[in-house]
UniProtKB/Swiss-Prot annotation:
The keyword Nucleotidyltransferase belongs to this UniProt entry's keyword annotation: yes
Keyword Transferase tagged: yes
Quaternary organization: Monomer. Interacts with T7 lysozyme; this interaction inhibits transcriptional function of T7 RNA polymerase.
Pfam families reported for this sequence: RNA_pol (PF00940), RPOL_N (PF14700)
EC number, as in UniProt: 2.7.7.6
Outcome of substituting K631R: Partially inactivated
Outcome after substituting K631G: Partially inactivated
Task performed by this protein: Highly processive DNA-dependent RNA polymerase that catalyzes the transcription of class II and class III viral genes. Recognizes a specific promoter sequence and enters first into an 'abortive phase' where very short transcripts are synthesized and released before proceeding to the processive transcription of long RNA chains. Unwinds the double-stranded DNA to expose the coding strand for templating. Participates in the initiation of viral DNA replication presumably by making primers accessible to the DNA polymerase, thus facilitating the DNA opening.
Family: Belongs to the phage and mitochondrial RNA polymerase family.
Molecular function terms from GO: DNA binding; DNA-directed RNA polymerase activity
Protein's UniProt name: T7 RNA polymerase
Length: 883
């Protein structure tokens, strides 16, 4: 076994950086200066340890080829080996006589697949196994190539069936053994139906498999020198063998790159001093530059980042600096509770991942004799394993968040650096941050409080009701909920481990934090200094922005832009319309029918039951369609989702969890049920927010025209190349949407994953614009850029007009301390109105791209969507627009 040793990085330059230390010491004292730089140093060490752990795990599992450290090596070697395989094929064909055994098996397989399997399998054997004899490695290569040939024919010969029925399920299996076992079952089923030409696979003989592997190793050596052969115990009976080793220069190349990657993979942490202000496109947030200085904008390349270097956007810089200057601290009371209950076997908070795996279902006594019982047990066990995989990942994340909270628990204040994605959405940089899940948000509170006062106490109670899920009713009813549950709240604050009513609420940890503050007001009165962040959340933010920019009164009313005595719940509105259709279909819908299906390849005719809308409606009525069924689909409409996307969401969010929990037994045909519901949601939401759908279609038309290549019809001369889409947000942030087709070609293997092959000839051309992605991405990216601009404008407005210093920000959620909540409530609305009164963002977008169109395209561009009669000033009077 080859050992790949990664040299440890020396990050001492971070902790010992003199310039940031002196700056920090002058402002915050030497102790905090040392601690801050030590934390930044530690972040790099933590990141390195995480990378090394992953690398070592991949080494042991034989998956080192999947690590980024090995991929450049493989990318370099692949073309060389592919060329050698092609040459060998030609050499063999040119010769007379009997052809080599290996050729007979390899000639029907793509050289790219043979080369990749050889390199990946060889690396796996040499870095994970002790038995690295030529025979052992050759046998492994031969078996892997046979598996690709055998099961790859399902993908290639029955592409439609594979894509529709097999691929997704195959990808859910983890590990070669389980993937192969699954494909064997699929193969048997397909053969029984006359697919694959009705021919069963004739397994390769062991000697033939080794012949194939040996020839592949020979070609690997001939073309790349990646490995070398060594004779062991020559002449010793029973011990004479030939081993294979990774060439030292290649082992060193992997180790060197792994070390470099480990050095630029920091696990960023909070700061114990205010973050470094942003003054340029790099170097803000953290005080020492480290190996990888933080970038203001998260882009896919340095070239993309450099576009922002000379952009004048003072309001953007100002907003990010105000946001990250917010002082936070750990909520010790919530932390004390979280430290205990997350270790309980039966945690009262439903969303907390358990410490131990759920027990497998009991095996039926007749499982060995009853195939149906075996199948049912396997299905139930598979659900447990699937849930456990997610549980492990979530548990690791939970324990890291708790570790971070405990680490910073005794600091009077901590801060979180912020930056943006390329659309301008604002993100906290560290892994532990205020934009996390309910527990993470509950563990944090703002560091600077003020006496709560009467108005602040009012908003505190509104916040408490929101955390309990009582947020779809008017404010008086929310207040009433809190007052009626006064005893419960006080009991939870006094003994949260004994009185766990708080754990039953919609956002349990945030509600627990509220309970403690509510009790504080009860004990100390309105002079109580409260620093709990109270959040005002948008009501389906994407549709709010589309409705505002188009003055759409119908859509605006559905998402609470207009004053109303009751809360408009667009998810509930759509669910109601869906239920009306379900009721009608249950009575007058279509009946089930038996449809005949003709196999395109074999001509075999089979029958299957297609559920009618009457049966499907009955299933959904039995399950119960509420806002939770429609929420994700409606929410993602403004971000580009359509009927097909809705189908997958319904399947993943509703049907599959219901089946796993035993509550979805009515869904006898999950895919049909999901498709039916997706269609109803699409129809219902399309008539609810007509203008938003129209705006999205208009944006797609614009992006499609820009991404089109214009040629002279007679000469074929290119008159205009494909263009990226560019626009500027109302606060001056430039957005470039530029999806490109990868220069590489993707190689898909059945069990060894995917790999992108570099072209063998470098054309020195930039890759082309991906027209499909440009079109499908424009609506979500455009509206995300608008809500990012609104957030930044709100931060600056609230800070400069109302003197607010503390902000809790999550895209369309705006929070601050109770004493300042009323002013932030106003600021969010004022900036929304100001933005769309002073900017016609769609007209501005048109102006920014129209000049790039060729004259022949101008008549293809549809007119700007018509505007409605929504009075933007009404937003100022709407209680529930952001509430």
């Amino acid at each position: 076994m080859n050992t790949i040793n990664i040299a440890k990085n020396d990050f001492s330059d971070i902790e010992l950086a003199a310039i940031p230390f002196n700056t920090l010491a002058d402002h915050y004292g030497e102790r905090l200066a040392r601690e801050q730089l030590a934390l930044e140093h530690e972040s790099y060490e933590m990141g390195e340890a995480r990378f090394r752990k992953m690398f070592e795990r991949q080494l042991k599992a034989g998956e080192v080829a999947d690590n980024a450290a090995a991929k450049p090596l493989i990318t370099t070697l692949l073309p060389k080996m592919i060329a050698r395989i092609n040459d060998w094929f030609e050499e063999v064909k040119a010769k007379r006589g009997k052809r080599p055994t290996a050729f007979q098996f390899l000639q029907e397989i793509k050289p790219e697949a043979v080369a990749y399997i050889t390199i990946k399998t060889t690396l796996a054997c040499l870095t994970s196994a002790d038995n690295t004899t030529v025979q052992a490695v050759a046998s492994a290569i031969g078996r892997a190539i046979e598996d690709e040939a055998r099961f790859g024919r399902i993908r290639d010969l029955e592409a439609k069936h594979f894509k529709k029925n097999v691929e997704e399920q195959l990808n859910k299996r983890v590990g070669h053994v389980y993937k192969k076992a699954f494909m064997q079952v699929v193969e048997a089923d397909m053969l029984s139906k006359g697919l694959l030409g009705g021919e069963a696979w004739s397994s390769w003989h062991k000697e033939d498999s080794i012949h194939v592997g040996v020839r592949c190793i020979e070609m690997l050596i001939e073309s790349t020198g990646m490995v070398s052969l060594h004779r062991q115990n020559a002449g010793v009976v029973g011990q004479d063998s030939e081993t294979i080793e990774l060439a030292p220069e290649y082992a060193e190349a992997i180790a060197t790159r792994a070390g470099a990657l480990a050095g630029i993979s920091p696990m960023f942490q909070p700061c114990v001093v205010p973050p470094k202000p942003w003054t340029g496109i790099t170097g803000g947030g953290y005080w020492a530059n480290g190996r990888r200085p933080l970038a203001l904008v998260r882009t896919h390349s340095k070239k993309a980042l450099m576009r922002y270097e000379d952009v004048y956007m003072p309001e953007v810089y100002k907003a990010i600096n105000i946001a990250q200057n917010t002082a936070w601290k750990i909520n010790k009371k919530v932390l004390a509770v979280a430290n205990v209950i997350t270790k309980w076997k039966h945690c009262p908070v439903e969303d907390i991942p358990a410490i131990e795996r759920e027990e497998l279902p009991m095996k039926p006594e007749d499982i060995d004799m009853n195939p149906e019982a075996l199948t049912a047990w396997k299905r139930a066990a598979a659900a447990v394993y699937r849930k456990d995989k997610a549980r492990k990942s979530r548990r690791i994340s939970l324990e890291f968040m708790l570790e971070q909270a405990n680490k910073f628990a005794n600091h009077k204040a901590i801060w979180f650096p912020y930056n943006m994605d390329w659309r301008g959405r604002v993100y906290a940089v560290s892994m532990f941050n205020p934009q996390g899940n309910d527990m993470t948000k509950g563990l944090l509170t703002l560091a600077k409080g003020k006496p709560i006062g009467k108005e602040g106490y009012y908003w505190l109670k509104i916040h408490g009701a929101n955390c309990a899920g009582v947020d779809k009713v008017p404010f008086p009813e929310r207040i009433k909920f809190i007052e009626e549950n006064h005893e419960n709240i006080m009991a939870c604050a006094k003994s949260p481990l004994e009185n766990t009513w708080w754990a039953e609420q919609d956002s349990p940890f945030c509600f627990l934090a509220f309970c403690f503050e509510y009790a504080g007001v009860q004990h100390h009165g309105l002079s109580y200094n409260c620093s709990l962040p109270l959040a005002f959340d948008g009501s389906c933010s994407g549709i709010q922005h589309f409705s505002a920019m188009l003055r759409d009164e119908v859509g605006g009313r559905a998402v609470n832009l207009l004053p109303s005595e009751t809360v408009q719940d667009i998810y509930g509105i759509v669910a109601k319309k869906v239920n009306e259709i379900l009721q009608a279909d249950a009575i007058n819908g279509t009946d089930n029918e038996v449809v005949t299906v003709t196999d395109e390849n074999t001509g075999e005719i089979s029958e299957k039951v297609k559920l009618g809308t009457k049966a499907l409606a009955g299933q959904w009525l039995a399950y119960g369609v509420t806002r939770s069924v429609t929420k994700r689909s409606v929410m993602t409409l403004a971000y580009g989702s359509k009927e097909f996307g809705f189908r997958q969401q319904v399947l993943e969010d509703t049907i599959q969890p219901a089946i796993d929990s035993g509550k979805g037994l009515m869904f006898t045909q999950p895919n049909q049920a999901a498709g039916y519901m997706a269609k109803l949601i699409w129809e219902s939401v399309s008539v609810t927010v007509v203008a938003a759908v129209e705006a999205m279609n208009w944006l797609k038309s614009a992006a499609k025209l820009l991404a089109a290549e214009v040629k002279d019809k007679k000469t074929g001369e290119i008159l205009r190349k494909r263009c990226a889409v560019h626009w500027v947000t109302p606060d001056g942030f430039p957005v470039w949407q530029e999806y490109k087709k990868p220069i590489q070609t993707r190689l898909n293997l059945m069990f060894l994953g995917q790999f992108r092959l570099q072209p063998t000839i470098n054309t020195n051309k930039d890759s082309e614009i991906d027209a499909h992605k440009q079109e499908s991405g424009i609506a979500p990216n455009f509206v995300h850029s608008q809500d990012g601009s609104h957030l930044r404008k709100t931060v600056v407005w609230a800070h400069e007009k109302y003197g607010i210093e503390s902000f809790a920000l999550i895209h369309d959620s705006f929070g601050t301390i109770p004493a300042d909540a009323a002013n932030l409530f106003k600021a969010v609305r004022e900036t929304m109105v100001d933005t769309y009164e002073s900017c016609d963002v769609l007209a501005d977008f048109y102006d920014q791209f129209a000049d790039q169109l060729h004259e022949s395209q101008l008549d293809k561009m549809p007119a700007l969507p018509a505007k409605g009669n929504l009075n933007l000033r009404d937003i100022l009077e709407s209680d529930f627009a952001f509430a």
